Amino acid sequence: MSDVVETLRLPNGATVAHVNAGEAQFLYREIFTDRCYLRHGVELRPGDVVFDVGANIGMFMLFAHLEHPGVTVHAFEPAPVPFAALRANAVRHRVAGRVDQCAVSDEAGVRRMTFYPDATLMSGFHPDAAARKELLRTLGLNGGYTAEDVDMMLAQLPDTGEEIETSVVRLSDVIAERGIAAIGLLKIDVEKSERRVLAGVEDADWPRIRQVVAEVHDVDGALGEVVALLRGHGFTVVAEQDPLFAGTEIHQVAARRTAG
């Protein structure tokens, strides 16, 4: 598996390393144009520590850095090819912090995951080829493509991913090892593993976290569980679904503390 990445000039003039241009452009629209991680009162402040869990190529890392150059970003991405782009982007843009090639969950160790070279944003620990194609079909239709065009694009998409092994860390272990006193924003995008990421935060560490924004796949009551967990730890929580994801299980949860 090659870790060679290409570069793309974004509409804001920044150049990023990427795995494929279509995904990079999608991420730019979501993160820079729509500012999807800064809604419902969520904000970045100078000097914030940001945890980017499921960083992919680091588009949110770059956004946070450009929004407030004084922030420090800890970015986590398990798949080697996106990680190569993530690391290149951190170096190119001199982002303060560090990048780690690992997954985040509720138990440290080593696990196997599925990496999709042609749809890296869907890589993760819960492979489901049929569900993946149905999601892509819905996104295509919601995005304004005709059913014929969507089916043609899906027919060209490989059905299989690559099995890879990755190290796994717990957030509370990272917080302790790095001496993190406060996290201004914890961003999570981990393809159905968000509950396990949050379960890796010990009760004593929750007061350190000011804000959480997570993509949540509402499978087996996940959305309700995540909302309840965050409210239980003192956050004001808003859950919403972007029109692009209408008809899918994907929602976004924004949580913040109303004081401090």
UniProtKB/Swiss-Prot annotation:
Pfam families on file: Methyltransf_21
Gene Ontology cellular component list: cytoplasm
EC nos: 2.1.1.-
Temperature dependence (free text): Optimum temperature is 34 degrees Celsius.
pH dependence: Optimum pH is 8.5.
Compartment list: Cytoplasm
InterPro entries named in the record: FkbM_mtfrase, SAM-dependent_MTase, SAM-dependent_MTases_sf
GO biological process, one term: methylation
Cofactors named for this entry: Mg(2+)
The entry's keywords: Cytoplasm, Magnesium, Methyltransferase, Transferase
Notes on activation and inhibition: Inhibited by S-adenosylhomocysteine and sinefungin.
GO terms assigned for molecular function: methyltransferase activity
Signal peptide per UniProt: none
Key word Magnesium present: yes
Assembly and oligomerization: Monomer.
Job description of the protein: Involved in the biosynthesis of FK506, which is a macrolide antibiotic with immunosuppressant activity. Catalyzes the transfer of a methyl group from S-adenosyl-L-methionine to the 31-O-position of 31-O-demethyl-FK506. Also catalyzes the methylation of 31-O-demethylimmunomycin, the C31 transmethylation reaction of 13,31-O-bis-demethyl-, 15,31-O-bisdemethyl-, 13,15,31-O-trisdemethyl- and 31-O-19,22-cyclic-hemiketalimmunomycins, which are all structural analogs of FK506.
Official protein name in the record: 31-O-demethyl-FK506 methyltransferase FkbM
Origin organism lineage: Bacteria, Bacillati, Actinomycetota, Actinomycetes, Kitasatosporales
